[in-house]
Structure formats: structure tokens, C-alpha cells
Amino acid sequence: MNNIIDGKALANEILADLKLEIQELKSQTNTSPKLAIVLVGDNPASIIYVKNKIKNAHKIGIDTLLVNLSTTIHTDDLISKINELNLDNEISGIIVQLPLPSSIDKNKILSAVSPSKDIDGFHPLNVGYLHSGISQGFIPCTALGCLAVIKKYEPNLTGKNVVIIGRSNIVGKPLSALLLKEDCSVTICHSKSQNLSSITSKADIVVAAIGSPLKFTTEYFDPESIVIDVGINRISGNKIIGDVDFENVKSKVKYITPVPGGIGPMTIAFLLKNTVKAFKDSYSTVCHSCL
């Protein structure tokens, strides 16, 4: 169906542009962006995600460093390792693969990453920039991917009613800030919201991001709505499904993203785009400091 949004194709366009940009940057600087990925433990899903990030990074000319640590590591020791990466001038961007073991203080770890290398956009300083409307720092990649998809299919967002189901720091909160900047009327709902279908069925755009498999069926959506499914739910081994009942909903809405193949590839594309931005920012800083 031509109303199914091909996130992989959109992501490939971004990656192709990034590859050319990296080639140009390398010719100018004789160096390449480098992404450090901190992986604690051996969570199977995390390992898959990390391998995918590394594969896509290498495809477009971004070097990578995988720092794989034991689940027994203490918060302070992990912070020390992150500080080493912060001080390494060869490292452009740093991501800490989530989730972390429960024994580790996640907030302390995310705050330990230098804001200038925080390409996930999770450091409190970068969060503050976004919610203050300051065009500086980094924005969470999934939120950027969602916005790019939405704007591709609805270029004029002024006055559009958008419902975001989910209030996470990764999707719901940052995406709401981005959409407010686009002059949308944004409603944030969550798993405790009442009469949810009566809210979502009036929306022009619905973003589902609560991690509840196939929860949202046809009665949740207006026939002219755009549906963005950010849910990633693993069932029956490695099979992944979204929060939206895709098979039944896809013919009942204007546009819809599938899972997999929708927002996932866009998230990786914007992660790498942020890596290139961090590289350019750091190189610009070095050049200016030499003047």
C-alpha cells in the first residue's frame, strides 16, 4: 500500500548525504568522525542494536570504538571510563547503550557524558536547550526521526493537532518540544490517561510510544490521520511488533509507519547525523582556538 511510510528508504537518503559530507570533511581535515559506544553487559537486544549502529556507521565512513564492560561495573568506575572518552580528542560522539543494569545510576551516567559529545541528547544541558527553545546542543535521535517523517508527509504543521502517547525522555518529551516549535497543538498522553481513544481519534497526527504490543486499534484513529509507531516490542524470540495494530489499522488511516522498518532506521540515521555534527563542532572549536 502506498500509504505505508518506508522509513528505511528515507533513512538511506540521509545516510547517502552524510557519506558525501564525510568524504568532503575527510578531504579537508584528513580525519573522520568517530563514535564511541559504551555497552554494559550482554543484553541480546542491546547487542543487536549496537551491531546495527556500527554497521551503518562504517557504511558511511564513521569510525567506531566499542567499549564493552561487565555488568558488575560500579557507577563510579563507569563514569571514569566515560571521562576517558570525554578527554579523547579522536572521539566525536559518545552513546551509552540503554538499558543499563539496575545497579548503575543511569542519571549519573548520562550526565557524565560531555554535552559536546552527547549525541543522544540526554545530558541535562542539552535537554534544557531543547525545552528552552535554544538552537544549540543535541536533540534525541528518535524524536528527530519522528519529526523528519512527519514533515515529509505533512510539510505544513502549523495548527495541526498532534497526540503523543508516551512521556519518555527519549521520545515523548523531546518530540513535544520539537512539535511546539512547529506551531502544533500538542497533547501528551500516557499509559494512565483515561478515555484515550476519544483524544487520539480527533488528532491529525498520532505518535504511539508506550511499549504496549498492538494496543492501538482502528477506533483510536481518524481516517485522515498520520500514525507514527515508535513501539518496539519483542515477541516470540526475535520478532518485533509495534504499539499499533498495523495489519488492521494500515488501511484505515492516511499514512502509517511499520514496525520494523519505520522509525528505527530513522533513529540510527539521525544518531549518525548528530555524530557528524559533533565532529564538525569540535573541529571548528579546535580551529578557532588556534587563531
Curated annotation (Swiss-Prot):
Keywords: Amino-acid biosynthesis, Histidine biosynthesis, Hydrolase, Methionine biosynthesis, Multifunctional enzyme, NADP, One-carbon metabolism, Oxidoreductase, Purine biosynthesis. One of its GO terms (molecular function) is methylenetetrahydrofolate dehydrogenase (NADP+) activity. One of its GO terms (cellular component) is cytosol. Signal peptide: none annotated. The lineage of its organism: Bacteria, Pseudomonadati, Pseudomonadota, Alphaproteobacteria, Rickettsiales. SUPFAM superfamilies: Aminoacid dehydrogenase-like, N-terminal domain (SSF53223), NAD(P)-binding Rossmann-fold domains (SSF51735). Belongs to the tetrahydrofolate dehydrogenase/cyclohydrolase family. It comes from Rickettsia felis (strain ATCC VR-1525 / URRWXCal2). Its EC number is 1.5.1.5, 3.5.4.9. Pfam families: THF_DHG_CYH, THF_DHG_CYH_C. Pathway: One-carbon metabolism; tetrahydrofolate interconversion. Coiled coil: none annotated. NADP(+) binds at G166, R167, S168, S191, I232. InterPro entries: Aminoacid_DH-like_N_sf, NAD(P)-bd_dom_sf, THF_DH/CycHdrlase, THF_DH/CycHdrlase_cat_dom, THF_DH/CycHdrlase_CS, THF_DH/CycHdrlase_NAD-bd_dom. Homodimer. Catalyzes the oxidation of 5,10-methylenetetrahydrofolate to 5,10-methenyltetrahydrofolate and then the hydrolysis of 5,10-methenyltetrahydrofolate to 10-formyltetrahydrofolate. It catalyses: (6R)-5,10-methylene-5,6,7,8-tetrahydrofolate + NADP(+) = (6R)-5,10-methenyltetrahydrofolate + NADPH; (6R)-5,10-methenyltetrahydrofolate + H2O = (6R)-10-formyltetrahydrofolate + H(+). This is Bifunctional protein FolD. One of its GO terms (biological process) is L-histidine biosynthetic process.
